[in-house]
Amino acid sequence: MLIKVPTAVRLYSVKRTPIKPFKEVLKRIQPSNTELSEKSKKNNIPEWKKQIISVKKKIGNERWSPSKRLSREEIESVRLLKRSFANITNTELSERFKVSPEAIRRILKSNWEPNDEEWEKVQKRWQRRGERIKELYANGGNISSNGHQVVENLVPHKKVIISSGRHMNTFDVIEKKVRSTKPTISIKDQKLKDKKLKLLEISATKR
């Protein structure tokens, strides 16, 4: 019998992974006491502290400055809603007032309320703002006794409500109508028109 011998034999080298010690394997399977204690600490942290940690992670070293701020009236209404409906959450209130839940949390946390002197200052400030708005739109027309601006050929566009918590003034912000972009008659055409009209007048007088 003839046995065929292969011309080229490929040799494969098998890499052997080093055997890891038993302690390392145990570490991967079972967490250490320190890891367990850290996890238990995290679980035992109260909700208010978790909230502070999450806010610090989001903001970092920056100062708290929300893009939208609620007025004094809106802040009071937030507090009133929370007192009336204890089960209402911060997220629900934030959706209602279009602010972040963190802003609602800070409003409910703070106990500051303005006294009579501060209320007077706020009212004066809003009065000054109202006067400024009246001056701004005084050029467009006259302002009636009820605080509304009366202007000819103008259309009401927006409404600005100025409130100090106790008094409220409403001003209509008004803008002019946009002129239509129709093609204007040229000077030559106008002259020809005038000539034709003159000729017609002359012919009418002759008759």
Swiss-Prot record:
It comes from Candida glabrata (strain ATCC 2001 / BCRC 20586 / JCM 3761 / NBRC 0622 / NRRL Y-65 / CBS 138). The gene is RRG9. Required for respiratory activity and maintenance and expression of the mitochondrial genome. Residues 1-12 form a transit peptide. Keywords: Mitochondrion, Transit peptide. One of its GO terms (biological process) is mitochondrial genome maintenance. Disulfide bonds: none annotated. The lineage of its organism: Eukaryota, Fungi, Dikarya, Ascomycota, Saccharomycotina. Its main location: mitochondrion. This is Required for respiratory growth protein 9, mitochondrial. The keyword Transit peptide applies.
